[in-house]
Every structure is written in C-alpha cells, then in structure tokens.
C-alpha cells in the first residue's frame, strides 16, 4: 500500500471551499432572521395580547385535564402517605395553596381520626403528666365562692352540713329592730328640706334604693315566720296527716287574707282579677290564630 500524498495547493483549495460554504450558511441565517423580524413588526399589539391570553387558557385547560385523570388506588395511597413540603406544591411551584381534592382528602382523614363524644356518665379523665394537688377538692365540702376568698366563716361552711334556717332566724331575730330603725332614719333624711341642697341626685337615689331593699327584706322574713307558724300549728292539730305544698300555699294565703285590712284585701283581689283577665285575653288571641 502506497501512502497518499497531499500537496499544499490541494489543501488550500479545500480550505477555500469550506469557508465559502460557511459564508453561505451564515448569509441564509441572516436572511431568515430579517424576514422573521419583519413579520413581527407588522403584527399589532392587540393580536399579540389575544394570542397570549389564548395560550394561557389552553395551559389551564390542559392542567385541569391532568388533574381530572383518575389514578389507581395504589398510587393514591402512596401519595397520601408521602406529603411534600409545604413550600412546594405537586406541580413543583413554590408558595401555592393546596388543591381542593387534597383539602377534601385531608379533612376526611381528620374526621375519621376524631374520637366519638363520650357519655356524661363516663368516669372523669385527667392527664398523667399533670401533677396531682395535695389538697383534693371533695364535692359538697368546699364552697363555690368562699373557697377562693381569704376569710371563711365556719358557721356557714358546707362541711358541717346544711344550715338550719329556723335556728338562724331565732338567733338573729334582733336584727329586725336595727333594720326598722335604719328605715326610719333614712326616711327622715329624705323628708328633710335641706337634703336636696346638700345631697346630689345620685345620693338621694341610693338612699331610696336602700330603703326599698330593707323593707323587702323585712317583709320576706315576716312572711317566712308566718308560714312556719301556720305549718307548726297545723302539724300540732293534724299529727297523722302529711301537708302537701299546694295545701300549705292555700293555708298561708287564707291566713294572710285574715290578717289584712279591708283596703289591702281589695287591692289584692283587684290585682288578681286583672291578672286573670290578662290570661284569658291571651288565651283568646291564641285560639283565634
């Protein structure tokens, strides 16, 4: 085999051919670029914006179609088990809200995990991590409001049983005299002509309110004493007969009517009559409807 001989002239000719080919390719590219730029110059801005909007709508529709495509159950379970970080979405976009399907899936999962509501008769539960207090709260022993206060009165403590109201009334009956004295003194202050000049309207109203509260307190205590006395007398006469609350109410009303003055009795009867008429009118209106 003879080795091929290349002359200097043949090599130069090849280089010239190669350079001419390159020049032609570059010239063609420049021509095509000029034509493209000329076409873009002729297109209006409105048509460009329309084309852009159309492309965006097409992209959205394609994304929706991709979402609507049902995946097999195995893939679904794998996706549910694997949760991507909160900053990156399924499409790889940053800081986007999760899709509605993902939210519905998570809400269903949470609803399944939620425990059922316990019965009110179930035993009370407490955390094992929380330390048990040395002073235990026993229901019925501690007062609701008095337990947190600084000072406690032993006489009214529930730990020593229920308070005997009759015994307390007998022990503190002397307070009625003080109450009546206070009412008379306050009435004198109001009747005085100098009170309007010396006292403000607010102070006068507070005195009136105090008189009213003291009077109502005295009246309630007197009514309670009367009820207890009537029940005591009835039990003394009828030992083997149990007194019902309705019978007790009737006996108390009768005793009150007997102790009333005729003018007071008329007022009470008139008030009851008006109340009864109001009830009847309400009943008529209800029946008409």
Swiss-Prot record:
<dbReference type="Pfam" id="PF06102">
    <property type="entry name" value="RRP36"/>
</dbReference>
<dbReference type="InterPro" id="IPR009292">
    <property type="entry name" value="RRP36"/>
</dbReference>
<keyword id="KW-0539">Nucleus</keyword>
<protein>
    <recommendedName>
        <fullName>rRNA biogenesis protein RRP36</fullName>
    </recommendedName>
</protein>
<feature type="coiled-coil region">
    <location>
        <begin position="162"/>
        <end position="224"/>
    </location>
</feature>
<feature type="compositionally biased region" description="Acidic residues">
    <location>
        <begin position="88"/>
        <end position="98"/>
    </location>
</feature>
<dbReference type="GO" id="GO:0000462">
    <property type="term" value="P:maturation of SSU-rRNA from tricistronic rRNA transcript (SSU-rRNA, 5.8S rRNA, LSU-rRNA)"/>
</dbReference>
<feature type="compositionally biased region" description="Low complexity">
    <location>
        <begin position="140"/>
        <end position="149"/>
    </location>
</feature>
<feature type="region of interest" description="Disordered">
    <location>
        <begin position="253"/>
        <end position="272"/>
    </location>
</feature>
<feature type="compositionally biased region" description="Basic and acidic residues">
    <location>
        <begin position="253"/>
        <end position="269"/>
    </location>
</feature>
<comment type="subunit">
    <text>Associates with 90S and pre-40S pre-ribosomal particles.</text>
</comment>
<keyword id="KW-0698">rRNA processing</keyword>
<keyword id="KW-0175">Coiled coil</keyword>
<keyword id="KW-0687">Ribonucleoprotein</keyword>
<comment type="similarity">
    <text>Belongs to the RRP36 family.</text>
</comment>
<comment type="function">
    <text>Component of the 90S pre-ribosome involved in the maturation of rRNAs. Required for early cleavages of the pre-RNAs in the 40S ribosomal subunit maturation pathway.</text>
</comment>
<feature type="compositionally biased region" description="Basic residues">
    <location>
        <begin position="63"/>
        <end position="75"/>
    </location>
</feature>
<keyword id="KW-0690">Ribosome biogenesis</keyword>
<dbReference type="GO" id="GO:0030686">
    <property type="term" value="C:90S preribosome"/>
</dbReference>
<feature type="region of interest" description="Disordered">
    <location>
        <begin position="27"/>
        <end position="149"/>
    </location>
</feature>
<dbReference type="GO" id="GO:0005730">
    <property type="term" value="C:nucleolus"/>
</dbReference>
<feature type="compositionally biased region" description="Basic and acidic residues">
    <location>
        <begin position="99"/>
        <end position="117"/>
    </location>
</feature>
């Amino acid at each position: 085999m003879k080795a091929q001989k290349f002359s200097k002239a043949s090599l130069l000719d090849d280089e010239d051919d190669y350079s001419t080919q390159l020049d032609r390719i570059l010239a063609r590219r420049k021509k095509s670029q000029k034509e493209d730029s000329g076409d873009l110059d002729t297109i209006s801005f409105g048509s460009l914006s329309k084309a852009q909007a159309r492309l965006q709508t097409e992209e959205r529709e394609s994304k929706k179609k991709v979402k609507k495509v049902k995946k097999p159950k195995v893939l679904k379970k794998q996706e549910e088990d694997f949760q991507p970080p909160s900053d990156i979405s399924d499409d790889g976009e940053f800081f986007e809200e999760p899709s509605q399907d993902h939210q519905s899936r998570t809400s269903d999962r949470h609803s399944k995990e939620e425990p059922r509501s316990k019965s009110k008769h179930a035993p009370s539960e407490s955390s094992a991590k929380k330390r048990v207090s040395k002073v235990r709260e026993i229901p019925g022993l501690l007062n609701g409001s008095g337990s947190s206060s600084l000072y406690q009165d032993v006489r009214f403590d529930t730990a020593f049983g229920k308070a005997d109201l009759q015994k307390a009334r007998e022990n503190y009956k002397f307070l009625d005299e003080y109450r009546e004295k206070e009412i008379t003194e306050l009435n004198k202050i109001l009747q005085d002509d100098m009170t309007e000049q010396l006292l403000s309207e607010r102070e006068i109203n507070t005195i009136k309110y105090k008189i009213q509260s003291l009077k109502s307190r005295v009246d309630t205590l007197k009514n309670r004493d009367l009820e207890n006395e009537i029940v005591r007398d009835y039990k003394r006469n009828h030992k083997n007969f149990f007194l019902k609350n309705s019978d007790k109410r009737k006996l108390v009303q009768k005793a009150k009517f007997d102790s009333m003055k005729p003018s007071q009795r008329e007022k009470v009867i008139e008030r009851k009559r008006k109340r009864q008429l109001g009830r009847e009118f309400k009943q008529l209106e209800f029946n008409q409807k």
